[in-house]
Amino acid sequence: MEWIKELYEEQNGILGYRQMTITVNRRHETHFNKKRIRRLMQILHLKSVCRKKKYNYIKSTPEVTAENILNREFYADAPDEKWLTDVTEFKYYVGAEVKKIYLSAILDIFDRRIVSYRIGTSNNNQLVFETFNEAVANNPTAHPLFHSDRGFQYTNKTFHNMLMEAGMRQSMSRVGRCIDNGPMEGFWGILKSEMYYLRKFSSKEELTKAIEFYNTKRYQLKLKCMTPMEYHSAAAA
């Protein structure tokens, strides 16, 4: 039980019994099952934070639209076959002042890693374009199916041309169907519920650290109890 208490405190209370089971077994080379860990956490009165779901829609007149080619096929046989993207809002606090920031990110379905991201003070085309350019620069041979919602940045003709020049096919969620971009929504849920809602960010750098933690230190059951970057490296070996 000491291991559980130590990990719970170390991770600021973000670990539910499933994540706790994976982390205990990875750290201590044990084979506890999730039922036992759940029971021990109940005895210790340890609970993880619950996720909050928020759906925001921005009306716009699209210049370019695409079919939902992804069609909720949330799996891939190798890295860089399918990328998902989205933008979401965060806040951080400098004294009593509240500052809004926006996170644009691209996620690989295969290993659930964040391929690239950008943090900005405005939810605009430039934020999305820079995120995409970074992903292409770091993965010049990648030509994935590129899926997004129908936000104004992604229905922009300039962005569509950028995708075509990079040799990527464009796919878009149906109107009002957040589940069509499910893994991306799942990433937002993890980031916000485990690393954001628990405390107030005091700088943009804290958001950067949270993303790096997700990519390199957060184990996932669907990734054979590896982190996204571990799973990515194993596939490339």
Language-model features: locations:
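C-terminal domain-tail junction helix/linker
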Residues: 157, 164-168, 190-237
